[in-house]
Amino acid sequence: MKRFFGFALVLGLSLMGIGCGSNSSSPGSNFQPAAVFVTGEDAPLSSVVGFSLTLNSITLNEQGGSTATVLSTPTTVDFARLLGLRSPLAFNSVTPGSYTSATFVLANPMISYVDMTQNPPALNTYTGALPQNPDSITVNFPSPMVVASNGLAGLKMEVDIRKSISVDATGQIVLNGSGQAIVNPVIYAKATKASDPDGEVTDLMGGLVSVNAGNNSFVLQGPYGRELTISVNSNTQFNSGWNINNLAAPAFVGVQGRFQADGSLMASGVEVVTSSQSFVSGRVLQVGTNGSGHLQVTMWIGETGADMVSWVDTIQTIDINAVTQYDICFMDNPFTNALFDSTSIEVGQRIFIGGSFVNSVFTPAMISLRRQGMYGTLDVGHVTITNGNAGNFLLNNNGLVGYSVGGPVTVNTYNVTFFFNLTGLSQLQSETTAIPLVTRGLLLKDPVSGTTQFYAGVVADPPQN
């Protein structure tokens, strides 16, 4: 069974394209003047499930003194929800040049923090206090962003939540005299290309707006209220039963892919998660049964359909006893049900539940396991290599996953796992210090040991400021 499970996960990781983003496509031919896309991600802090900041503007600074604005409309972004994944924030035309830094104007931080000592877990919300509101932060790039005429460049920004929110020696959030959480944003920014491993959009989900099958494209209402055109081609992988010709609203769709020069996204993968308008998505905090013996899950709700928006940023307990459809994101093969079902929902997982919402009652019909990120430090001396990059290592995580496991988390890797800023599993085996690591993939129960383990498509050495 262990061998079968491992094979199924290798197949799953390959199909999801979370190994190294190898399903890249050539940019389209409809070039505009030089353009820049912006993606955001985060490095999570334990038990913080929501960390929103309003980005008032993002400005590129050219080495000759000129500037170019890539975001001018205030946009509220919850970086904690990204869970180590990359989401598109902006796309704009700029003057060709060599840009050496970016200035971010931030405002209105809000923090949602889970208290796992309560039963059920309780949610605390804090207003954050910046050094000044709004706060302006200029970040130098490790190397210049060179934007050529008719070219396309990317700006990757990462908010380090661990360092941005002040905590005491016990890990509790520090409040000022007004009861506000002290926030000093720590941002890492770098120039990237759409073809780079860290230039790929890995977390884009939204509602289907329209489909143009003749043009091999559709429009998605993505995060932050922006509509994005998604292009597909013969290399785009759809989940089973779906293609550009039978897409129709209502539908909630997941996409991974790369920006093109015209601002559209060339999709390497398209997943129709559900054709239902009602859904919730977030982190599992507790799994158990109610008084009737029905299986129920308690989760922090990060996203919902338009009809359930009042549930956002709340903790809800949902009866899932009648659910029979269990899926894994961007994975649709005969092994799916062997990997994820009602017996394998675990604390810390990121899941999506689709169903109906009538008279304020949510009736779930399907559950999908989503990709997620996990931050921690290497447990030195606990690295096993089976063959090449196939093996595992232990990661010390003081967040929800570490809480669920009750100690270091086993991270399984494969020869399709992409090691970013690392040479591979052999480097981890030779490390003598507890270096920080970010893993991205799936959190699942091992069917042999019964323990919760992480199955990584990406292992990265996070940027250090």
Where on the chain are the PLM-derived regions?
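Short helix-loop boundary/capping segments
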Residues: 387-391
